[in-house]
Amino acid sequence: MNLMAGSFAHMANLLFPRGCAGCDKPDDVLCDACLASFDCELSQPLETAEMGRWFACGWYRGAARQSILAWKDHGDEECDRPFSDALCRLAERAGVIDAMDGVREICDTILVVPASSSIASMRQRGRRHMMPLAKRLSAFLRCRTGFRVQVCDALTNKGIKGKSVETKGTEQRAQRLKGHVMVRPGVTLQNKAVILVDDIVT
């Protein structure tokens, strides 16, 4: 099956050649140079978080920004895998696995929650673009720790106008979301630890 899938992928690339999502270098989903822009370990204090900080794979600029836009708003689903891998590497470097051991005694499940998009954005994209990344991270953490880790589509957006990429800086993005993001009816987060995953840190 893998050989057949590889053959089809090779044929598709011959018929419809692609370029790197970040710089358009031929025959790469993300070339090594652009992929390196997601191999950072950025963090800032976040007092309400269990670890006391948020973490990011890279700065939203240059090739990283271009590739995120190609993936998020122009349907480049082949970026799911390299972005997922970058997220898993970040989780390991940032100490998420060690932090999970710290909450083992106080919660029975860790939920990986993808940040929600507006209904209009999801209709335009035809999918929940963060879900493949959340599933990959959940499987990675479950394999590494043996802990019960699940993906939970816990959040919903209502009444948000415009796109996050059209705002400038975290303050504008935070104002755009304020009062519009809520937990879905019927979802309980009691006795659960939550890892929130987003494409752009807000």
Where are these regions (language model features)?
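Glycine-rich phosphate/pyrophosphate-handling loop used in enzymes and phosphotransfer proteins
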Residues: 1-202
